[in-house]
């Protein structure tokens, strides 16, 4: 196990955001346990297995918009340094080092993606994301690597692909992300495990 960071302000954070009502109330983790490791693993497994609830992120246009938002908020707005991410049908995992307060970082992402997703899905303006989230501060290098792999292997664990690189809406993807239409274009280049670099053009965001 590596040495812990000395300064909490530069610590990476493992975040999970899920869709509103993506888990039945009776099976959602209690509020006071949602940052507990065992509770998180159980909840994450349920998110991959649950047969009810919204799966809006399964829609390609919505998933691509969310990926774009993750990169835009990192590379253009500078809210965080993005290390790894995956967009699953009903939740998002990311590993990032925040440059702003975590509540502000989360609120900015959820606000713009909720607005865009509701428009893409032709849904009435309503809560899109579950209000509470899971977050864990990463203090050791070994833990950083484990979480990075955990995130990128999520589609494999869920039986969606055989190899992590086959899943398009993930930092593991070997494909460039090209959004349909003339409005958006992004070419993503995965670097070493220090961040996510890209060449980005995003008009009318």
What are these regions (language model features)?
Residues 1-205:
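Short catalytic/metal-binding and nucleic-acid-binding patches
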